[in-house]
């Protein structure tokens, strides 16, 4: 622990020195930079309890950074969380590097706007809590932290994954209360060690949104999605999967802090080889609740849709529920909770997988820059059919203690 503390202090010193450097005035033109930036560094020691990982211990050094500019016409944001985990004693559990990077660039004009985003990740297992998806690292959980992607709804053990999701959205104002919405998404999921089904998906959507008043809006949207499987190391019969959905959405801003959103509609599913995935008509929908109060936030999300199968099935019907809550007390103590339930029913006769997780975290700001934290996470998964050995098939508990370097948010201004 003393060695880790020395390492953390050294890294903090280097980072602060870099941020504090004064760059001399250049003779040429400079690109103005303005925005808010924040970063954290964490060191944690983790114990795993349950099954083959009972009494295993590991250590994690991690960090996260976030930046958003102040531009109203060209908004840009960046968020990255990653680190490295190594085994201390017992059976190694998800050791190695991990990272999740998210970029977003917008263009806002008087009658139209364009939003481009990309999310890329490398992990040692399916994501659960926090932006990085790795439990016990010390990064924030709960609150408005986005739920894990539905492309990995099956919990795994020591399973390297590479994932990327590129998204584009275009909105055009047609009149005072009507706008045209167009978008597209391309996703990929890869298993470098060959212990999962590589999956690609492409989605195109279009629709209209009607603004009823300052707080309420309705929308109708059509979505086309195609799933394909370029790599299949599990020996399952695969086929291209196509879904068509029509969703009708209602959104309401109850206050400046509270927003609810819900959509529902029919979904038609068909496989290129109907012997593997026959044609079917289903229901697709989602609902969300967001509350951003003064000293914290809360969220609740539900999704019912057809997925590519979570890396272990050829298509799946997914029910996903995720909740988060965080609250700050007296500017020194923060408590946070997050949890989720994921049910994946294989299309055809592939069985049902039920996964769930829950986490609690306590953070204490010891001084202006340093924090201490403790967290507890529990994962559990059951399946009605046999799954590969790298799919979680037991209850796993994760207990973590650590320290962090967490300076206040910085505001950057240059002309």
Regions found by a protein language model. Name each.
Residues 2-10:
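Sec-dependent signal peptide recognition
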Residues 11-20:
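Hydrophobic h-region of N-terminal signal peptides that target proteins for export
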Residues 19-415:
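Gram-negative and organellar
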């Amino acid at each position: 622990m003393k060695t880790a503390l020395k390492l953390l202090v050294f890294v903090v010193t280097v980072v602060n020195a870099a941020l504090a450097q004064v760059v001399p005035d250049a003779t040429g033109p400079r690109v103005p930079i303005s925005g808010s930036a924040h970063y954290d560094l964490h060191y944690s020691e983790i114990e795993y309890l349950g099954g083959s990982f009972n009494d295993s211990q590991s250590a994690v050094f991690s960090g996260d950074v976030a930046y958003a500019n102040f531009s109203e016409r060209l908004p840009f944001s960046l968020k990255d969380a990653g680190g490295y985990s190594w085994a201390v004693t017992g059976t190694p559990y998800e050791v190695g590097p991990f990272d999740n990077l998210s970029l977003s660039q917008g263009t806002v004009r008087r009658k139209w706007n364009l939003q481009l985003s990309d999310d890329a990740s490398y992990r040692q297992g399916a994501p659960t809590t926090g932006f990085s998806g790795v439990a016990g690292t010390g990064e924030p959980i709960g609150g408005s932290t986005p739920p894990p992607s539905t492309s990995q709804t099956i919990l795994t053990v020591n399973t390297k994954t590479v994932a990327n999701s590129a998204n584009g959205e275009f909105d055009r104002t047609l009149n005072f209360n009507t706008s045209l919405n167009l978008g597209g998404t391309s996703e990929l999921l890869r298993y470098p060690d060959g212990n999962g089904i590589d999956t690609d998906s492409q989605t195109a959507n279009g629709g209209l949104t009607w603004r009823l008043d300052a707080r309420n809006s309705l929308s109708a949207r059509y979505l086309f999605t195609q799933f394909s499987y370029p790599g299949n190391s599990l020996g399952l019969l695969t086929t291209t999967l196509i879904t068509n959905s029509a969703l009708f959405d209602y959104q309401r801003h109850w206050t400046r802090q509270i927003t609810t959103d819900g959509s529902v509609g029919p979904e038609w599913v068909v496989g290129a080889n109907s012997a593997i995935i026959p044609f079917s008509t289903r229901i697709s929908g989602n609902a969300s609740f967001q509350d951003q109060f003064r000293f914290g936030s809360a969220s609740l999300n539900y999704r019912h849709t057809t997925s590519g199968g979570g890396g272990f099935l050829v298509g799946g019907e997914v029910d996903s529920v995720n909740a988060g809550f965080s609250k700050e007390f007296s500017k020194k103590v923060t408590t946070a909770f997050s949890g989720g339930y994921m049910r994946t029913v294989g299309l055809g006769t592939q069985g049902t997988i039920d996964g769930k997780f829950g986490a609690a975290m306590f953070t204490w700001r010891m001084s202006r820059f340093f924090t201490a934290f403790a967290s507890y996470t529990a994962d559990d998964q059951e399946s009605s059919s046999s799954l590969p050995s790298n799919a979680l098939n037991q209850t796993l508990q994760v207990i973590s203690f650590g320290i962090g370097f967490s300076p206040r948010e910085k505001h950057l201004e240059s002309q």
